[in-house]
């Protein structure tokens, strides 16, 4: 595909190619990153992974994938700024006669003769040239052959001679004796565990829809700094965890109802707890996306890959975009599912979410109007207004929940509605059932139970390990968002924005 390229900056427009199921180009268009791409479906993920092989055959590298709905089963693929990977970078070679890995499993994949050849950033030589030793994981999943390793990285890349932290990796080795490289995974969040993701997806890679990837690549999940088995943040005491497990306290949420003053005060208390309980409290100032991307480049070098191959979901697409901006010469095949627009501010991104959810809600209402049991009558506008008014009253009079469940206030009820409305039209009857009981009997039991059946949530997170993982994801989300998007504006502008959101997106 000579002559087709995207600008080197992620903040400019990109050339998007629309492929059909057979990876044939059926259209192309230029997209400005100020227009938020829509999300992909889970089915699309499996199809898009074929692009790793298909685009390799074409001599091109995939650097972003979204899936704006088009006619038929089509997908949008962005080519990176090299029009032909094999002609612009030294090629990777494989063979059984040479190996960069030692007998103890350090370095690259067994049987690989990959060589990084990439430039090592000044001052980071010791990190890029450390030994990487893979060992059998102590918590291996039955039927897999996971290997684990730990990488040391600077706490602060601007001062690499200072404190260091560790990043944990978990690898599902390729079924090939001469793999072409590695594919790194990020589940999103921010705050998601890549190690948990690879545990959950092992079956797909071993014998399911992703087996073609494992036939060519090692697949590696890693816990970003501050998460899981990497140097973690800890913003809670052991007693806090026990209280949540026992049901005496409620796990925190990324959405906190209350006034701005209440939220700021809560944040101050939580920040103090993070400083108190975190082993390396300075990590809270270095959980930004750019630092995670720089960690990824260290990992890329240590597995002996010249280019980074990466698969990111949701926030992971933003991480992938930041990596391509920081290391444009080290970009391999990067698949981004449910893409975030990297040019948007935090406020613009959240507003885009609300707009999408609200539009999906309107589509749901239109599909249910006139059906037996649907509790929202009138036009679509009237139905939305009635639902918003109903939700607004729940803070003063929450929905009851049977069997000892906690009452549903506005925040919890709207989150349950959102879960059911955005999941799939196939689940919309579950939402209608829950709304009917909530609005006719002021009982939120069915609404909550139906939402939990899709999200996997409900009540206590379960074990201590699950509780800690939840706590880390919530606090890591806050730390990362605050570092990536510092607050701008003032109380007056925030009040004006809130009034605008309530007018334009009355439900969500």
Feature map (PLM): residue ranges:
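N-terminal export and membrane-targeting signals
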Residues: 22-51, 309
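Alpha/beta-hydrolase fold nucleophile elbow
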Residues: 305-314
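Conserved acidic catalytic loop of the alpha/beta-hydrolase fold
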Residues: 293-306
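Catalytic-loop region of hydrolases
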Residues: 29-32, 43-47, 59-261, 384-387
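A catalytic-pocket lid/entrance helix-loop region that shapes and gates access to the active site
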Residues: 208, 234-248, 324-386, 433-442
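Alpha/beta-hydrolase fold active-site neighborhood
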Residues: 385-508
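Active-site loop->helix "elbow" adjoining a glycine-rich segment at hydrolase catalytic centers
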Residues: 314-319, 327
């Amino acid at each position: 595909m000579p002559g087709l390229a995207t600008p080197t900056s992620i903040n400019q427009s990109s050339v998007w190619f629309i492929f059909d199921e057979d990876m044939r180009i059926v259209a192309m268009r230029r997209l400005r990153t100020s227009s938020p791409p829509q999300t992909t479906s889970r089915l699309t993920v499996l199809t898009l992974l074929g692009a790793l092989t298909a685009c390799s055959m074409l001599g091109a590298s995939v650097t972003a994938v979204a899936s704006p709905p088009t006619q038929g089963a089509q997908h949008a693929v962005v080519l990176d700024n090299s029009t032909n990977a094999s002609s612009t970078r030294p090629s990777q070679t494989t063979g059984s006669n040479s190996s960069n890995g030692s007998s103890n499993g350090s370095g690259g994949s067994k049987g690989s003769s990959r060589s990084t050849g990439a430039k090592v950033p000044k001052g980071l030589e010791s990190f890029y040239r450390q030994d990487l030793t893979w060992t059998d994981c102590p918590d291996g999943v039955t039927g897999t052959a996971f290997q684990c390793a730990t990488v040391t990285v600077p706490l602060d890349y601007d001062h690499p001679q200072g404190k260091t932290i560790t990043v944990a990796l978990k690898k599902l080795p390729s079924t090939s004796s001469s793999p072409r490289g590695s594919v790194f995974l990020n589940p999103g969040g921010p705050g998601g565990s890549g190690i948990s993701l690879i545990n959950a997806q092992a079956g797909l890679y071993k014998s399911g829809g992703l087996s073609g990837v494992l036939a060519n690549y090692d697949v590696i999940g890693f816990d970003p700094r501050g998460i899981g088995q990497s140097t973690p943040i800890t913003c809670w005491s052991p007693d806090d965890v026990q209280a949540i497990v026992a049901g005496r306290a409620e796990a925190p949420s990324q959405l906190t109802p209350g006034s701005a003053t209440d939220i700021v005060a809560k944040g101050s208390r939580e920040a103090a707890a993070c400083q108190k309980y975190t082993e390396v409290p300075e990590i809270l100032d270095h959980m930004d996306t750019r630092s995670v991307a720089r960690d990824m480049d260290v990992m890329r070098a240590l597995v002996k890959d010249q280019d980074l191959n990466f698969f990111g979901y949701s926030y992971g697409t933003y991480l992938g975009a930041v990596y391509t901006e920081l290391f444009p010469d080290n970009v391999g095949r990067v698949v981004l599912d449910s893409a975030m627009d990297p040019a948007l501010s935090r406020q613009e991104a959240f507003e885009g979410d609300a707009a999408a959810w609200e539009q999906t809600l309107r589509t749901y209402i239109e599909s249910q109007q006139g059906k037996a049991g649907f509790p929202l009558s009138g036009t679509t506008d009237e139905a939305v207004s009635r639902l918003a008014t109903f939700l607004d009253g729940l803070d003063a009079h929450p929905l009851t929940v049977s069997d000892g469940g906690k009452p549903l206030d506005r925040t919890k009820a709207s989150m349950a509605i959102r879960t059911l409305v955005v999941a799939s039209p196939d689940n919309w009857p579950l939402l209608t059932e829950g709304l009917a009981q909530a609005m006719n009997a002021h009982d939120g039991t069915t609404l909550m139970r139906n939402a939990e059946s899709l999200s996997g949530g409900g009540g206590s997170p379960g074990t201590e390990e699950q509780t800690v993982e939840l706590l880390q994801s919530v606090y890591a989300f806050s730390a990362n968002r605050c570092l990536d998007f510092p607050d701008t504006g003032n109380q007056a502008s925030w009040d004006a924005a809130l009034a605008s959101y309530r007018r334009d997106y009355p439900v969500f």
